């Protein structure tokens, strides 16, 4: 029969180890964010697909080489206040809370920075635990990385096709048979219109809903001047 007095220290050691491992896992994304100021990071979904043998297609492209219409369209579609918030759009958060209190379907309030946090370090799907982890990560990412770099990462890790097409290059090649550097304003807006559901919406064979969204984003993208955003971000 085991001695409860002797087993108590072992139990405490196990608990300490578990706590230390949990703290290390929580700290890892914050350390990796600093390293992701450079390089070509991949998403957790890409890693999972590689691990399970599912197809993954991704070719990194620097944001300077992407057709300017695509980052403008994505900002117009996904996060109109991208240049002015600090990782979280609190107005959108309040709208989501109001929707929940009124019993209405949530419109979603994730910024591009929050989506980068989720894609790089967390998991897809709706979860309060994930949201609780995502919020401080988004604030940290916005603090550590320039806006231009955040958007560059997003454009290279977003899922843009039904068969493992990740990033703007793979998405543009799948939908239009061309490089992300060669996208027209309409093509860029069409790619933006299928986010964040490329398995449900298609840029290759867009339905009426996608075409309507794309037409809206073409107009909005003309007003999304990002050069000033990059300058202001560097000066702040």
From Swiss-Prot:
The EC code for this enzyme is 2.4.99.28
The catalysed reaction is: [GlcNAc-(1->4)-Mur2Ac(oyl-L-Ala-gamma-D-Glu-L-Lys-D-Ala-D-Ala)](n)-di-trans,octa-cis-undecaprenyl diphosphate + beta-D-GlcNAc-(1->4)-Mur2Ac(oyl-L-Ala-gamma-D-Glu-L-Lys-D-Ala-D-Ala)-di-trans,octa-cis-undecaprenyl diphosphate = [GlcNAc-(1->4)-Mur2Ac(oyl-L-Ala-gamma-D-Glu-L-Lys-D-Ala-D-Ala)](n+1)-di-trans,octa-cis-undecaprenyl diphosphate + di-trans,octa-cis-undecaprenyl diphosphate + H(+)
TM helices/strands, residue ranges: 17-37
Which locations, inside or outside the cell, does it occupy? Cell inner membrane
Superkingdom of the source species = Bacteria
Where is it mainly found?
membrane
One Gene Ontology biological process: peptidoglycan biosynthetic process
Sorted keywords for this record are: Cell inner membrane, Cell membrane, Cell shape, Cell wall biogenesis/degradation, Glycosyltransferase, Membrane, Peptidoglycan synthesis, Transferase, Transmembrane, Transmembrane helix
Q: Which InterPro entries match?
A: Glyco_trans_51, Lysozyme-like_dom_sf, PBP_transglycosylase, Pep_trsgly
GO MF, one example = peptidoglycan glycosyltransferase activity
> What is its pathway?
Cell wall biogenesis; peptidoglycan biosynthesis
Identify its membrane topology class.
Single-pass membrane protein
GO cellular component term of the entry, any: peptidoglycan-based cell wall
Family per UniProt?
Belongs to the glycosyltransferase 51 family.
Matching entries from PANTHER family are given as: BIOSYNTHETIC PEPTIDOGLYCAN TRANSGLYCOSYLASE, MONOFUNCTIONAL BIOSYNTHETIC PEPTIDOGLYCAN TRANSGLYCOSYLASE
Summarizing the function annotation, the protein's role is: Peptidoglycan polymerase that catalyzes glycan chain elongation from lipid-linked precursors.
Protein name in the entry: Biosynthetic peptidoglycan transglycosylase
- The gene coding this protein: mtgA
């Amino acid at each position: 029969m085991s001695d409860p007095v002797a087993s108590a220290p072992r139990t405490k050691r196990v608990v300490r180890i578990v706590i230390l491992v949990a703290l290390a896992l929580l700290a890892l994304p914050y350390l990796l964010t600093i390293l992701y100021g450079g390089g070509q990071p991949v998403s957790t979904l890409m890693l999972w697909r590689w691990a399970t043998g599912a197809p993954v297609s991704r070719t990194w492209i620097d944001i300077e080489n992407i057709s300017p219409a695509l980052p403008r369209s994505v900002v117009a579609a996904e996060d109109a206040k991208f240049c002015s918030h600090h990782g979280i759009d609190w107005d959108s958060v309040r709208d989501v809370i109001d929707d929940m209190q009124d019993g209405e379907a949530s419109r979603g309030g994730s910024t591009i920075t929050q989506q980068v946090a989720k894609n790089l370090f967390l998991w897809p799907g709706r979860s309060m635990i994930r949201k609780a982890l995502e919020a401080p990560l988004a604030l940290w990412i916005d603090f550590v990385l320039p806006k231009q770099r955040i958007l560059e990462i997003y454009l290279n890790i977003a899922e843009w096709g039904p068969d493992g097409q990740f990033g703007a290059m793979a998405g543009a090649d799948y939908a239009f048979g061309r490089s992300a550097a060669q996208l027209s304003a309409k093509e860029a807006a069409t790619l933006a219109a299928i986010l964040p559901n490329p398995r449900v919406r298609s840029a290759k064979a867009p339905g009426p809903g996608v075409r309507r969204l794309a037409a809206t984003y073409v107009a909005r993208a003309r007003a999304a001047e990002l050069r000033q955003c990059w300058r202001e971000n560097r000066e702040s």
